[in-house]
Amino acid sequence: MAELAAGGDQRAALLAAATLFPPPPDGARFSYGTAGFRAEGAAMGPAVCRAGVVAALRSAKLGGAAVGVVITASHNPVRDNGVKIVDADGGMLSQDWEPFADALANAPNPDALLQIVLQFAKDEDIKLGGSHSAQVLLARDTRPTGEYLLDVAVKGVNAVIGAVAVDMGILTTPQLHWMVRSKNKGLKSSETDYFSQVIDSFRCLLELVPKDKEADVINNRLIVDGANGIGGLKLEEIKAKISGLDIHVRNSGKGEGILNESCGADFVQKEKVVPLGFGPEDVGFRCASFDGDADRLVYFRIVSSSDTRIDLVDGDKILSLFVLFIREQLDIINGKDNKGNEVLPTRFGVIQTAYANGASTDFLKNIGLEVVFTPTGVKYLHKEALKYDIGIYFEANGHGTVLFSDHFVSQLESLTSEFSSKAAGSSQHQAAMRLLATSQLINQAVGDALSGMLLVEAVLQYKGWSFQNWCDLYTDLPSRQLKVKVQDRNSIVTTDAERRVCQPNGLQELIDGEISNYSHGRCFVRPSGTEDVVRVYAEASSEEAADCLAKRVAQHVERILG
């Protein structure tokens, strides 16, 4: 093979790694999605090794730019584990490479794996055998299988001659994304640098809170559910350095309970009940919840010590809070200049999926914002957000972020400098500094529960808002989700960001007919990305109506698709 600069050695290295971790003969097929590869931790060895190979080849393809591998299964039970590849921009693996990752993970034997790698390297013009440098940063969460699987990933990386594996330690998933992005931009990229940037930018935002907004309604006590995972541990490490907040961590990962078991953002958002680890002393206080690898964030308040129900603030309402804050700063800056032009013209994009609660979308539209919809999945939301000067997206589950384009940040820095020399301390100067600090605080690579939580706290203090003020932005419409088992989920074809059905013929008309029977009715169906079911989502003005609408539409799906 001409594409192998050190043919025999490279072949031998790949064959040896594949032989060490053969897939079980009856193993399930892997499919690389938003979550990467996931399964029971004990069965993940082969997929993790092969993901290491993919990451090393991706780095080689990109001229040696750092690529990341994180060992985590996020909000899944502790017995599970997984592997995700972080692309050089700090985002998710390029979708163009997902079929190759699938093919490699499912290669039945070492020879098949070798041939897949050789063909792909030839197609992508990747010179193997050490002529291209490659570097892969690796991290893991706190799962018991994590240490072993990280070692397996290192062996996969090392199977590509010339690739260097760097163990960054036990980290949150967003920390590794941040590190990869920062390293490739030539910025400081250690964990210490991450913490310094987050803490300093949060402190800056607190210093810019207007004196008249420093109201008594803001209690600085914040109770955080760490899901018994890495996010709780990291918060415990730095909470003493975070000014302006009295942080108490429950489910910190120091042995109080089991990872993600009856706690964490996924549990809180779906079950809408008090997580384990909270008691009567927490009633009425502002609470935040991370998921297992700290890339999701939701807030809640315990209503009563005699009731497990909570007041939930999900990703939709976090998005709404951030939108109000950012737009207010832009409005302050854009006091018209002498020519009637905007001082800082800004393309501000708000991105949601069909699963966003209709009340949140109505709220955003009613304050004059255009909402753009994408298909379900962070990779679609993130890609759309990148098109704007400021692009913000959140899923209801609490995963999301605010993206600032490099060009916009550069403009903002110049404007801040100009204000500093001509109008230091003016409202415009302070608003520009707030936006700059926000761009430093919120993770520019991926959703990050820790930095997102600090931005929430800074905005609440800026606005002088209590938790109740935040809750009162709007009232969520009741919703219901159902799954319908079908013979072939792919016989459903959707359009308009999965909000309408174009195949099979006639189904959308039936859905529209059902929706018309309910006040504030909304319903859509879409094929599941992971199992042979069709997912039904319905909203209406009451829980009973939402239930009825979902069931009626599910019956139509079942009748037509069997």
Curated annotation (Swiss-Prot):
InterPro entries named among the record's database cross-references: A-D-PHexomutase_a/b/a-I, A-D-PHexomutase_a/b/a-I/II/III, A-D-PHexomutase_C, A-D-PHexomutase_C_sf, A-D-PHexomutase_CS, AMG1_II, AMG1_III, PAGM
GO biological process: carbohydrate metabolic process; UDP-N-acetylglucosamine biosynthetic process
Cofactor comment: Binds 1 Mg(2+) ion per subunit.
Protein residues bound to Mg(2+): 74, 291, 293, 295
Cofactor: Mg(2+)
Binding of substrate, residues: 395-397, 526-530, 535
One protein family per Pfam: PGM_PMM_IV
One Gene Ontology MF term: magnesium ion binding
Keywords tagged on the record: Isomerase, Magnesium, Metal-binding, Phosphoprotein
PANTHER family, A to Z: PHOSPHOACETYLGLUCOSAMINE MUTASE (PTHR45955:SF1)
SUPFAM superfamilies: Phosphoglucomutase, C-terminal domain, Phosphoglucomutase, first 3 domains
Organism: Oryza sativa subsp. japonica
UniProt keyword Oxidoreductase, yes or no: no
Signal peptide: none
Family membership noted in the UniProt record: Belongs to the phosphohexose mutase family.
Active site as annotated: 74 (phosphoserine intermediate)
Role played: Interconverts GlcNAc-6-P and GlcNAc-1-P.
EC number(s) given by UniProt: 5.4.2.3
Involved pathway(s): Nucleotide-sugar biosynthesis; UDP-N-acetyl-alpha-D-glucosamine biosynthesis; N-acetyl-alpha-D-glucosamine 1-phosphate from alpha-D-glucosamine 6-phosphate (route I): step 2/2
Classification via Gene3D superfamilies: Alpha-D-Glucose-1,6-Bisphosphate, subunit A, domain 3, Alpha-D-phosphohexomutase, C-terminal domain
Name the UniProt record assigns to this protein: Phosphoacetylglucosamine mutase
Substrates-to-products reaction catalysed: N-acetyl-alpha-D-glucosamine 1-phosphate = N-acetyl-D-glucosamine 6-phosphate
